[in-house]
């Protein structure tokens, strides 16, 4: 997936990180899994949203890519 296929908020933050206005996180996979886990655990959100986040987090965890 490329940035242009993402929502406006993601594109805005991408531009801010690229320009140095927002912090870059070297351990991006760990950051993504934590954020997805937070969404999956938030019982105030619709179940469908939580399940999508949990599925994405589980796939990242089972992948062979590791942050170093």
Curated annotation (Swiss-Prot):
<comment type="similarity">
    <text>Belongs to the UPF0253 family.</text>
</comment>
<dbReference type="Pfam" id="PF06786">
    <property type="entry name" value="UPF0253"/>
</dbReference>
<dbReference type="InterPro" id="IPR009624">
    <property type="entry name" value="UPF0253"/>
</dbReference>
<protein>
    <recommendedName>
        <fullName>UPF0253 protein VP2335</fullName>
    </recommendedName>
</protein>
């Amino acid at each position: 997936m490329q940035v242009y296929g993402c929502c406006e908020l993601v594109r805005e933050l991408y531009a801010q990180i690229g320009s140095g206005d927002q912090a870059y996180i070297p351990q991006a996979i760990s950051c993504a899994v934590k954020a997805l886990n937070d969404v999956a655990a938030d019982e105030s959100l619709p179940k469908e949203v939580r399940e999508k986040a949990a599925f994405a987090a589980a796939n990242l965890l089972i992948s062979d890519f590791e942050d170093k």
